[in-house]
């Protein structure tokens, strides 16, 4: 029998996926695209875009792997379960990307400018960067970090997601799904502790 402290976070991730797929409903999809366009075209000060560019590091695969290795070194008893949860979250995101195949906003809408130096080659749904950042923010809570650090990590995860929409790499519902997959996966792992 699966314990509630594992099942409920898994349901959170599933809810993120299903609600994220609401972009397939025409009116919701139009609203998602409009919001992506508005965020992408908003006049922000240069420092804000530079900050979002730096913050994006928190969603990269290399940063994700480095933090997971450091966590496993700090708490060896976490290593196997943490690795399994992280691999499961990555696999879910990748499987959804190859199955759903949602085009990137910058490729689907000429009004959206790609604000990245490297053009992403995979599909848009879900945002794996948002998933990784959310996973790591949940890890700060599970690791017993002070409340301010947990809040800062959660704000960083939301910032990574906002930056992905701002950059033209994702729609808001891609980010929403990625955040909930990441939170769900790390909370499911934490439920096994």
Listing of model-derived features with the role each one plays in the protein:
Residues 20, 85-97, 156-160, 164, ...:
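Alpha-helical transmembrane segments of multi-pass membrane proteins
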Residues 7-11, 52, 77-85, 148-152, ...:
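Alpha-helical transmembrane segments of integral membrane proteins
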């Amino acid at each position: 029998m699966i314990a509630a402290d594992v099942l409920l976070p898994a349901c959170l991730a599933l809810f993120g996926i299903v609600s994220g797929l609401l972009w397939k409903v025409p009116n919701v999809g139009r609203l998602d695209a409009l919001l992506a366009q508005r965020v992408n075209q908003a006049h922000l000060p240069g420092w804000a875009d530079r900050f979002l560019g730096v913050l994006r590091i928190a969603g990269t695969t290399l940063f994700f792997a480095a933090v997971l290795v450091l966590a496993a070194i700090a708490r060896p008893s976490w290593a196997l379960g943490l690795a399994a949860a992280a691999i499961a979250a990555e696999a879910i995101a990748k499987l959804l990307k190859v199955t759903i195949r949602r085009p990137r906003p910058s490729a689907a809408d000429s009004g959206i400018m790609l604000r990245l130096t490297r053009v992403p080659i995979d599909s848009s749904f879900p945002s794996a960067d948002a998933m990784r950042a959310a996973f790591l923010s949940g890890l700060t809570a599970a690791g017993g970090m002070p409340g301010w650090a947990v809040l800062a990590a959660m704000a960083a995860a939301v910032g990574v997601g906002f930056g992905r929409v701002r950059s033209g790499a994702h729609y808001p519902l891609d980010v929403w799904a990625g955040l909930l997959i990441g939170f769900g996966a790390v909370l499911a792992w934490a439920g096994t502790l």
